[in-house]
């Protein structure tokens, strides 16, 4: 479904993968923080008519569902993530629905990666742990999205596959930009029907350039996965998170 067709909470869906990307303007390096979708955090709840019912602690991925699948959902997520990270201001957001995943895979082309674990092997033997495989538009959604919902913390395990692909995807986009400087603009235009953002193409170019100076290692919000009464939960280690926020966003002299 294209984003333009979304209007209500019923259309919005949940936030499946949540990343915070920070660029150090002095060093022009990126740091990436991954927030597990089942993280228990303070979110704002709304009734179907859009009236706020106040704040509650729940899975952070649900915050997106209380919006409209467009700007409102993104703004709600931006606020929830900022609160989780001790009030760090977040300037921009970029959201892509599942329809855009295979489109990115088609436009970027074949990417070779090493399968990081065995979480997909039973479902698809092609993705055997340690195997070198090719990810493209035909199988990228399977690689990034599939999880066994019968297994506890399957979303947390799946996150490692997403990190692996992201780390390989960015250099491939950089390679294509060297050959064709307009590639990123064309890519963003092609997937625009499936995305919501308040950032211009120039910001993406800056971030991609900064990625070339970075290791692209992704840090998880510190915590542990636990089994809730109904669904999996991820409980944040607040002390370790505070240390991560300080080391990522502040210069301590």
Please report, for each region that a protein language model flagged, where it lies by residue.
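Non-catalytic, solvent-exposed segments at the cell envelope interface
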Residues: 1-253
């Amino acid at each position: 479904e294209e984003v333009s067709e979304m209007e209500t909470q019923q259309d919005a869906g949940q936030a499946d993968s949540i990343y915070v990307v920070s660029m150090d303007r002095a060093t022009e390096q990126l740091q990436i923080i991954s927030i597990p979708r089942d993280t228990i955090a303070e979110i704002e709840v709304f009734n179907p008519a859009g009236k706020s019912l106040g704040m509650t602690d729940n899975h952070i991925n649900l915050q997106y569902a209380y919006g409209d699948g467009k700007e409102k959902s993104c703004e709600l997520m931006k606020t929830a993530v900022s609160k989780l990270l001790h009030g760090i201001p977040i300037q921009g957001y970029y959201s892509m629905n599942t329809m855009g995943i295979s489109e990115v895979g088609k436009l970027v082309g074949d990417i070779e990666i090493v399968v990081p674990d065995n979480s997909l092997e039973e479902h698809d033997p092609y993705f055997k742990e340690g195997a070198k495989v090719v990810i493209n538009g035909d199988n990228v959604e399977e690689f990034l999205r599939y999880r066994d919902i019968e297994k506890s913390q399957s979303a947390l395990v799946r996150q490692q596959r997403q990190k692996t692909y992201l780390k390989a995807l960015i250099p491939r986009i950089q390679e294509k930009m060297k050959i064709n400087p307009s590639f990123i603009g064309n890519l963003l235009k092609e997937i625009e029907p499936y995305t919501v953002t308040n950032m211009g193409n120039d910001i993406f170019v800056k971030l991609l350039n900064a990625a070339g100076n970075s290791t692209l290692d992704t840090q998880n919000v510190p915590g542990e996965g636990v089994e809730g009464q109904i669904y999996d939960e991820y409980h944040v280690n607040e002390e370790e998170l505070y240390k991560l926020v300080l080391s990522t966003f502040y210069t301590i002299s």
